Every structure is written in C-alpha cells, then in structure tokens.
Amino acid sequence: MSEGGGQVSCIFAAPTRLCRWPALIECGVNLTQPLCEWMIQVARDRTLSLAWEVASLLTLSSSEVGLEGVGTIWPSSYSSEESSRNGAEQGRQLSIEGPFQGQNCPSHPAAALPLPMRGESQATSCQV
C-alpha cells in the first residue's frame, strides 16, 4: 500500500502501537509525514465513532434494554427545609420514576459525603 509517499510492508496487528518504535521496527514501516497524519486521522475517526456508539447506548430507556419495570432514576438538586433556614447545608436527592415513584432516597448531609477527587463526579447512593 502506498499513501502519500509512505509504504507499509505488512498488516498491523496492534494499531494502538503504530507510533511507537517497536511496532515500526516489527512491521517494517517507512513513514512519511502525510502517512502519519493519515493514520492519526483514521484513529481519530474511529475514536469518535466509538464515542457515538457509547453515547447512543446511554440514551436507551430501561424498556429498550430489557429492564421493564425497573424505572429511571434522575439526580436532582434540592435544599432541605432546615438548610433553607440556616443556609448552611445543601445536598442532593434522587427523584424516581417508575414503580418506586413518590419515594425519595434518604438525604445525606453535605459534610458526610466524601469530596470527589479531581475529574470524578460526586454520586449519591440510594437503596430503595
């Protein structure tokens, strides 16, 4: 195969190792800048394609994945009556749709929840 002046003399078995020297030596690749840019673009396109596949799975309802009757749990912000009076604490609760509709998860004081580490989201656990 010839692409932009570069030549690939074999089939890559590990595409994630394309830009590492061991893979280049094993596969005998003569890379030029256009070929490298083309490979990066192909990798980007594949990554975006996979991201869209995952995103579409996340938007499925419980009935579409065979979990009828389980219901859907949505996070929602709230401020308890006591917190509203003193303005000190704010927490989160879960609003529940489905067979558990009308039941709320127990609220936790904000101080009792561990602070999320950088890059993590804070989750509220609930057992109904």
From Swiss-Prot:
This is Saitohin. Its main location: cytoplasm. GO terms for cellular component: cytoplasm; cytosol; Golgi apparatus; nucleoplasm; nucleus; perinuclear region of cytoplasm. Was called 'saitohin' in honor of the late Tsuanao Saitoh and his laboratory. The keyword Cell membrane does not apply. Residues 77-128 are annotated as: Disordered. It comes from Homo sapiens. The keyword Magnesium does not apply. The lineage of its organism: Eukaryota, Metazoa, Chordata, Craniata, Vertebrata. It is found in: Cytoplasm; Nucleus. Keywords: Cytoplasm, Nucleus. Interacts with PRDX6. Highest expression in placenta, muscle, fetal brain, and adult brain, with lower expression in heart, kidney, stomach, testis, and adrenal gland. In the central nervous system, highest expression is in temporal lobe, hypothalamus, medulla and spinal cord, with lower expression in other brain regions. GO terms for biological process: positive regulation of mRNA splicing, via spliceosome.
